């Protein structure tokens, strides 16, 4: 990306093998020679400007794909560690124990300069912390702990005596988050990590975890599960009137069914904070803020 397009050796040029001719020969077995031989090069040339335009226009998405899928998978195989585990090793050697702010800054630096972490990031983080401080919730439920980044943001902003329950479905990821949370200085009485899928945990919150109401909920796991989990919270009467539900990644990768439900059911006041992805500001995303009016 960003470099001039050049002809590849072997594609065109006098005296050089033409790869398109090989394609023509293969296709000519099933199609008339005159039709294939005259149309294939023309079609290829016609589509070339379109391909180049798409690559330029969506270069940020291409970089994200390479960084989060291809390079990450390669590093996972070579190191035997997941990206969250590599990030935690970096935190251990560069961050100050007991200082959640410094740990968060260290994770931001890791994501910007080492490997993209797919975390909430500082811009969205400021929105989250401001809302937690503003609402002063007695109990917060987070669905999707991941590496623990947003968990630390919430824990920092909780009022005295506040409680945070955070749910992570992957045991290996949860183990990393648990160590990060304790490294930051938050004990189990303040921040409790539950390992399990949100679909299984939500129905058990009242009986097994003594959570009768969640004043603030953060949805930050899989956007396609947001609507299901919101309806589960409603069905089990875990949202009091006035409760705040925050949902990340509602624009990218997007949660259209969740947003449509929140806007049309008549039980929520909705607001959308437009942001970009951390380290990819050109890719537009947003945080949805829902205020629950009650079951009526």
Swiss-Prot record:
Subunit text? Interacts with LHFPL5, PCDH15, TMC1, TMC2 and TMIE. Interacts directly with TMC1. The interaction of TOMT with TMC1 and TMC2 is required for the transportation of TMC1/2 into the stereocilia of hair cells.
Look up and give the organism this protein is from. Answer: Macaca mulatta
Any further remark recorded for this protein: LRRC51 and TOMT were originally considered as alternative reading frames, LRTOMT1 and LRTOMT2 of the same LRTOMT gene in primates.
Per UniProt, which keywords does this protein have? Catecholamine metabolism, Cytoplasm, Deafness, Endoplasmic reticulum, Hearing, Membrane, Methyltransferase, Neurotransmitter degradation, S-adenosyl-L-methionine, Transferase, Transmembrane, Transmembrane helix
Q: What is its EC number?
A: 2.1.1.6
Substrates-to-products reaction catalysed = a catechol + S-adenosyl-L-methionine = a guaiacol + S-adenosyl-L-homocysteine + H(+)
Q: Which GO terms describe its cellular component?
A: apical part of cell; cytoplasm; endoplasmic reticulum; membrane
Biological-process GO terms, alphabetical: catecholamine catabolic process; developmental process; dopamine metabolic process; methylation; sensory perception of sound
* Keyword Cytoplasm among UniProt keywords: yes
Q: Where does S-adenosyl-L-methionine bind?
A: 142, 144-145, 150, 168, 198
> Which family would the database say this protein is a member of?
Belongs to the class I-like SAM-binding methyltransferase superfamily. Cation-dependent O-methyltransferase family.
What Gene3D superfamilies would the database entry show? Vaccinia Virus protein VP39
**Single GO MF annotation:** catechol O-methyltransferase activity
- Could you read off the lineage of the organism from its UniProt record? Eukaryota, Metazoa, Chordata, Craniata, Vertebrata
What protein am I looking at?
Answer: Transmembrane O-methyltransferase
Its annotated function is as follows: Catalyzes the O-methylation, and thereby the inactivation, of catecholamine neurotransmitters and catechol hormones. Required for auditory function. Component of the cochlear hair cell's mechanotransduction (MET) machinery. Involved in the assembly of the asymmetric tip-link MET complex. Required for transportation of TMC1 and TMC2 proteins into the mechanically sensitive stereocilia of the hair cells. The function in MET is independent of the enzymatic activity.
Q: What class of enzyme is it?
A: transferase
Which segments cross the bilayer?
36-56
Which PANTHER family is this protein grouped with? CATECHOL O-METHYLTRANSFERASE 1-RELATED, TRANSMEMBRANE O-METHYLTRANSFERASE
